[in-house]
UniProtKB/Swiss-Prot annotation:
It catalyses: 2-C-methyl-D-erythritol 4-phosphate + NADP(+) = 1-deoxy-D-xylulose 5-phosphate + NADPH + H(+). 1-deoxy-D-xylulose 5-phosphate binds at residues 126, 152-153, 179, 202, 215, 220-221, 224. GO terms for molecular function: 1-deoxy-D-xylulose-5-phosphate reductoisomerase activity; manganese ion binding; NADPH binding. Its EC number is 1.1.1.267. Signal peptide: none annotated. It comes from the Bacteria. Pathway: Isoprenoid biosynthesis; isopentenyl diphosphate biosynthesis via DXP pathway; isopentenyl diphosphate from 1-deoxy-D-xylulose 5-phosphate: step 1/6. The gene is dxr. Belongs to the DXR family. Gene3D superfamilies: 1.10.1740.10, NAD(P)-binding Rossmann-like Domain. This is 1-deoxy-D-xylulose 5-phosphate reductoisomerase.
Length: 398
């Protein structure tokens, strides 16, 4: 039976990879809705190729631009805009599968709507779980939704875990691998001078700018630890992080009998996306087979928390619980945006997040409104801290 997809965040890197897999299997997958924020021209190209019933953008001006181009090309795709439209296409009867690939807190509401509608959810928006893990997982369970992780690490763990939840007691711990990003071996004293372009040059993966910076600070790995806690139900002290520069082993599961299962593959997001799209079957993802003889060597090391303070902050937020993870995520989003706009330096990202966590009293949220209030408060505090921060040094040009 053909799956009907709503793809949230279709113009990003996950969206590109998803549509590449979809295009390879038109008999298996069709597109009900595509969404983008402001990249209207790319969305038009996607709509003309995949003919969704609905396209959603962030604002009225972008919607008018997209609609004009689609009508001129003879497309009948309906164009909507705004947060409610994202929610509507996520819970619509027109789709059975929602690929949640919007970056950041903006992806929470539509992902939660998909869970409450009992959809099959391919989750790439880790912020949904970082901000409101208990609320989100309760919605998945209460409404019979199916959650399939798309992040390469969590998809790897999913593949290495037993399908029968009654057998999960045999798991000792899970191990998330991390490349270490572009600054794994860089002299720590020089990190203050890192530029946005340098931070966005990931050694192994092709990703968007925000997640590339998160990888460079290793905040991304910290968020993934929190995500793994909620998806797989393990406490933080049974989730390890291991630096693996080659990005060939995507994660591991250690069992009580001494066995360790690992999932390997070339670093290409089409592999976990294809796995989640077709699960429990397997389909061609367009990815080359892994040649271990050519790679020859795999290396590992423990993370350096001094070099990567954002990772330590994320682990601390998970341990503290309450609204700490939501505040961590919100402050990080504001700080990364400021760094990409060259308003703060690279090391100020961690300093900003730390300052927000120290300034914001932790508390247990009573519901989604409390989580969103904490998110807004953390963003306000982060913006205030950044406004008072000294300007970063200007790069010399020759």
């Amino acid at each position: 039976m053909q799956k009907r997809l709503t793809l949230l965040g279709s113009t990003g890197s996950i969206g590109d990879s998803t549509l590449d897999v979809v295009a390879r299997h038109p008999e298996r997958f069709s597109v009900y809705a595509l969404t983008a924020h402001r990249n209207g021209d790319k969305l038009v190209e996607q709509c003309l190729r995949f003919a969704p019933e609905v396209a959603v953008v962030g604002d009225a001006n972008t919607a008018a631009h997209v609609e004009a181009k689609l009508r001129a090309a003879g497309s009948k795709t309906i164009v909507l805009y705004g947060p409610q439209a994202l929610v509507d296409v996520s819970k619509s009867d027109g789709c059975d599968t929602v690929v949640a690939a919007i970056v950041g807190a903006a992806g929470l509401a539509p992902s939660l709507a998909a869970a409450r509608a009992g959809k099959r959810i391919l989750l790439a928006n880790k912020e949904s779980l970082v901000m409101s893990g208990a609320i989100f997982m309760d919605a998945v369970r209460d409404h019979g939704a199916i959650l399939l992780p798309v992040d390469s690490e969590h998809n790897a763990i999913f593949q290495c875990m037993p399908r029968d939840e009654n057998e999960h007691g045999g798991i000792s711990k899970i191990i998330l691998t991390a490349s270490g990003g572009p600054f794994r071996t860089r002299e720590p004293a020089t990190l203050a001078d890192v530029t946005p372009d340098e931070a966005c040059k990931h050694p192994n993966w092709v990703m968007g700018r925000k997640i590339s910076v998160d990888s460079a600070t290793m905040m991304n790995k910290g968020l993934e630890v929190i995500e793994a806690h909620w998806i797989f139900g393990l406490p933080g002290d049974r989730i390890d992080v291991l630096i693996h520069p080659q990005s060939v082993i995507h994660s591991l599961v250690s069992y009580r009998d001494g066995s360790v299962l690992a999932q390997l593959g070339n670093p290409d997001m089409r592999t976990p996306i294809a796995h989640a799209l077709a699960f429990p079957e397997r389909v061609d993802a367009g990815v080359d087979q892994l040649d271990l003889a050519q790679i020859a060597q795999l290396s590992f090391e423990k993370p350096d928390y001094t070099r990567f303070p954002c990772l330590a902050l994320a682990l601390k937020a998970l341990e503290e619980g309450g609204i700490a993870s939501a505040a961590l995520n919100a402050a990080n989003e504001i700080a990364v945006e400021a760094f990409l706009e060259r308003r703060i330096g690279f090391m100020a990202i961690a300093a900003t997040v730390d300052a927000v966590l120290n300034a914001l009293p932790n508390r247990s949220p009573n519901g989604l409104d409390d989580v969103l209030a904490a998110d807004a408060e953390a963003r306000r505090l982060a913006a205030e801290i950044i406004a008072k921060a000294p300007a970063p040094r200007v790069e010399r040009t020759v």
